[in-house]
Amino acid sequence: MYRNGWGSKPGQECVLAIHLRQQAFEDYLRQAVYSSYHEGLGIERAEWQAQVKQSEVRLQWDPDHDPYGEKLPRRAIQLGLRGSVIKRFAEEDIVLIEEISAYVHEQAEHVHKQQLQHLVLPQESPLHIEDAALRTYLQLDT
């Protein structure tokens, strides 16, 4: 909710919860190219630039945030989809779409009143990825 200001940023007042098939999400991760170059990728910058141009999935790790917007030690993944992948996302990979704007605005009130004990948030758990090469590429064990 940090990124859309609890549904209060202009143009981001409508909040959707999109449920995907887990296999689809993992497929996106396998196709992803980091949005920024760093030496830990193990390839030259020119090769990375070529991959970025061809890729239909961009990957970026950002700090995760607590309800007040303070950074947490864990990271949150952002994926950007385009081309045939976005078509597949829309037509095949979505299991459920929920319009949750009212719920998000209610939860924001608890945050603004500093009443976090009243927050009702989804229970999160880390996604376990068994593919060792993918885990390494995503730097999940660092």
What spans do the regions from the language model cover?
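Conserved NAD+-utilizing ADP-ribose enzyme module
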Residues: 9-16, 22-142
